[in-house]
From Swiss-Prot:
<dbReference type="GO" id="GO:0005737">
    <property type="term" value="C:cytoplasm"/>
</dbReference>
<keyword id="KW-0648">Protein biosynthesis</keyword>
<dbReference type="InterPro" id="IPR002317">
    <property type="entry name" value="Ser-tRNA-ligase_type_1"/>
</dbReference>
<feature type="binding site">
    <location>
        <begin position="353"/>
        <end position="356"/>
    </location>
    <ligand>
        <name>ATP</name>
    </ligand>
</feature>
<comment type="pathway">
    <text>Aminoacyl-tRNA biosynthesis; selenocysteinyl-tRNA(Sec) biosynthesis; L-seryl-tRNA(Sec) from L-serine and tRNA(Sec): step 1/1.</text>
</comment>
<keyword id="KW-0963">Cytoplasm</keyword>
<comment type="function">
    <text>Catalyzes the attachment of serine to tRNA(Ser). Is also able to aminoacylate tRNA(Sec) with serine, to form the misacylated tRNA L-seryl-tRNA(Sec), which will be further converted into selenocysteinyl-tRNA(Sec).</text>
</comment>
<dbReference type="GO" id="GO:0005524">
    <property type="term" value="F:ATP binding"/>
</dbReference>
<feature type="binding site">
    <location>
        <begin position="266"/>
        <end position="268"/>
    </location>
    <ligand>
        <name>ATP</name>
    </ligand>
</feature>
<dbReference type="GO" id="GO:0006434">
    <property type="term" value="P:seryl-tRNA aminoacylation"/>
</dbReference>
<feature type="binding site">
    <location>
        <position position="289"/>
    </location>
    <ligand>
        <name>L-serine</name>
    </ligand>
</feature>
<dbReference type="GO" id="GO:0016260">
    <property type="term" value="P:selenocysteine biosynthetic process"/>
</dbReference>
<dbReference type="InterPro" id="IPR033729">
    <property type="entry name" value="SerRS_core"/>
</dbReference>
<feature type="binding site">
    <location>
        <begin position="235"/>
        <end position="237"/>
    </location>
    <ligand>
        <name>L-serine</name>
    </ligand>
</feature>
<keyword id="KW-0067">ATP-binding</keyword>
<dbReference type="Pfam" id="PF02403">
    <property type="entry name" value="Seryl_tRNA_N"/>
</dbReference>
<dbReference type="Pfam" id="PF00587">
    <property type="entry name" value="tRNA-synt_2b"/>
</dbReference>
Amino acid sequence: MLDITYVRQNLAEIESMLQNRQLASEKPRLRQLLEYDKNRRELVQRSDEMKAQRNKVSKEIADIKRTGQGSGEELIRQMKEVSDEITMMDATLSKLASDIEEILLSLPNRLHESVPTGKCAEDNVICKAPVPYLHLLDFPIKNHLELGRSLGILDFERGAKISGAGFPVYIGKGARLERALINFMLDYHTDHHGFTEVFPPFFVNQESLRGTGQWPKFADQVYHIEEDNLYAIPTAEVPVTNLHRNEMIDAERLPVSYVAYSACFRREAGSYGKDTRGFLRVHQFNKVEMVKFTRPEESYQELEKILMSAEAILQALMIPYRVLLLCSGDISANATKCYDIEVWSPAEEKYLEASSCSNFEDYQARRMNIRFKADSRSKPEFVHTLNGSGLATSRLMVSLLEHYQNRDGSITIPEALRPYTGFTSIDQLTS
């Protein structure tokens, strides 16, 4: 959430940000916000004056009663009128505060100066050229669906029977491979990159979703359990970032770095017409997430570290990938700067998003009231929060299966995963 003072003092920047994000339609709400803010500040001043007058009259009434000079009835009548007006003002102020917060919660974050201006995904900038790991595929290539079926390791049909479309079932060595990927990534981030592992709840309350920015803007994308008023998490970012909600973090601990595995649940409302085959778009998937809390002056340096940590996984697995810097029209509403890592699918002949690494500056921390003090004499400041997928297994599995397939239809397990799988290949089923 943006600071209302910052919005008021940097109106031209905020309007430009909305324009660059292709959200010019939000400008009337911005003007409404400033009108609410102006009315609130004027009313606060008037309310303070009235309260000062009430205190003055109360003292005069007390003096009259103490000295016995008159009944003070007129002053009592005046004080009642003032008190009634203050009560009405307080109610109006409460409504204005609610209206201001509602608009602030819906406004997107500011953009970092390095974010390229663009309208859509086609305008994203390739900031790291494709990193090729040559796997000789000089035979007809099968896609991950064909491989999963022929090897007996993936079953989307039974998943649909159990839960509906978008809920895959991993079987046998497929289940072992999925678990191996998760454990490998967790170990890599904790052992090589200094992250502390967290195993968070998979269901959160509305306040947690609001803290990270998924609520109310993306309310239609989350699964809701009405009886308990809990929500299935769309990403481990939500519970892990909320670990420090309403807390003051010791400055000496910063940056705080967490990594967490979770299942992720997304309704994917509005995905009609998009490619939903296999793992390309699912309602439930597994992901390892990195989350950082940093000092403001260190957050962009830490963003680069998160990106390198995610890249290191693909380098260890020898999966071809590229890195994009998202443009202003494609970046998420909460982020000031975001990199996407895309893995290559030989069968689809295109890149698939497998990770997003984002800096939110104080946008989430302000919502969640997460602060630190640089030293004992300093005023509390909001931390900066960052996160990055490290990685999502679904699209990673697509690229892995397709790249490591062999002419006979078997899959060779990448060397980095073999200590976790306990096997070196997945062979064709025999009838």
